[in-house]
C-alpha cells in the first residue's frame, strides 16, 4: 500500500508524543498548506509533497533543543532533514518526494530558493 498523509501525521504525532504544542502547530500548518494547495490547484504529487513538508517542517525542534539547547531555525534546518528522511523512508515514500521534503525543511526559515 502506498504511504499517505495520514501515515505521516501518525508518525509525527508518535515522534512528538508529550508535546501537544508541536503536534497542534504541525496540524495547523498542514491545514493551511492543504487549503493553499487546493486553491492553487497544484498537481497530486506536488500536493503530497506540500502536505508532507507542512506536517514535518518542525520535526527537528526536539533534537535541536537536546543538542544545542535551542530550537533556533538554523538548528532545525540542520537536524530536521535527516529525521524526515528516516521517517519517510520507513514509510516507503518515493525518493523524489523525500528529497524535496528534506530540501523544504532545510530551507524552512529562509525566504529564498525554496520554490
Where do the model's predicted regions map?
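Acidic/His-rich, divalent-metal-binding segments that scaffold phosphate/diphosphate chemistry
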Residues: 1-64, 70-73
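Divalent metal-dependent catalytic cores for phosphoryl transfer on phosphate-bearing substrates
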Residues: 48-115
